Amino acid sequence: VKGRRSRVIHSAMNQNSYQQSLDYLYGLEKFGMIFGLTKVEAILEAIGNPHREIQAIHIGGTNGKGSTAAMMASILQKEGYRVGLYTSPHLTRFTERIKVNGKEVEKEEVATLTEWMKKRIEAAGITPPFTFFDFTTAMALLYFKQRMVDLSILEVGLGGRLDSTNVVDPLLSIITNITRDHEEQLGKSILKIAGEKAGIIKKAVSYTHLRAHETGR
């Protein structure tokens, strides 16, 4: 009975810590969208620059980038690679955003990572505003380093050039179909939008553009 009670108390404490972490993370949404890499780079510096120690595939575009990321992760996993996958937004649970070999990050791990990162960020003198996506991107990269993934697949949140995920120096950049979206942030023309999304293409890095096939009616 004592053992069972202890497990129940421990589970409740973990759930409370996880909820506190979510409250902190979602509280960052009050800062809205802040484009640029300055804050996420500062956060990564404070936590040891984990992105420099993992191999990444970076996927941007307008349509299909999430499904492309998921398919690539599945294929690579079947080939024997240990694969980290970072996508957004989530459908029902925050933990859907960060996976290793198809398994979502545990709630307890989210709580532990959040608290550890907060302490390191505060010690480094980094103060808000930084965004929910800045923090969660850094969290995903740290988690992938800790779990010693062979490859990490990162889906761009919005745009590309100034997106928080663009801190990585990837093995491969992929851009899916490009159409008009988020014109207030990315530009009013398809050319400007494409230019922002193409910002994930790095010098001396392989890239590919996946175009949707048009069918006649």
Regions found by a protein language model. Give the residues of each.
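Phosphate-coordinating loops and pocket residues in cytosolic domains that bind phosphorylated ligands
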Residues: 27, 187, 195
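ATP-dependent carboxylate-amine ligase catalytic core
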Residues: 37, 41-52, 78-168, 180, ...
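Short loop-to-beta-strand entry elements in the cores of soluble alpha/beta enzymes
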Residues: 201-210
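Membrane-proximal helix-turn-helix segments that form the acceptor-binding/catalytic region
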Residues: 194-202
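Conserved beta-strand/loop subsegment of P-loop NTPase cores
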Residues: 174-175
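Short functional linear segments
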Residues: 10-61, 68, 74-79, 86, ...
